[in-house]
Amino acid sequence: KDSLSFSDGYPILLASEESLEDLNSRLKEAIPMKRFRPNVVVRGAGAFSEDRWKEFQINDIKMYGVKRCCRCKIPTTNQLTAERSNEPTKTLETYRKGKVKTSGVFFGQNVIHEQRNWFSETFLSRRTISIGDPVRVLNEGEIPETSKSKKN
């Protein structure tokens, strides 16, 4: 059985620099991307375009968008001072609120990657992602706010 440890429900959080730039343009004080804790950050597709990526590929790794990421309170904490505020949640509520999960705000997308067998993982593919690697969007469409396979 596949399992997941030390993550917040999904192994990958995807966000774009343009999405953060859009958010920061609405805030009194800009915040860094690290507040959202993404492990894949892209640039060049436009603000919140990652919301619609059903399938994309980096090197030989196919990834699948599962659901938009409903944000907890962690991004409201300044990681340098440990001080909390109501931002960025308050601003996200003005334009990134859910339709189904109306109590939440969304930033980024929860993503899973394609599973392969040991041989192809070891010998046949480039399974490392590095800064600057190109991203190829294979399929776009509506991504749900919630997942039927996970509790939210």
For each of these PLM feature ranges, what is it?
Residues 1-152:
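Metal-cofactor-dependent catalytic cores
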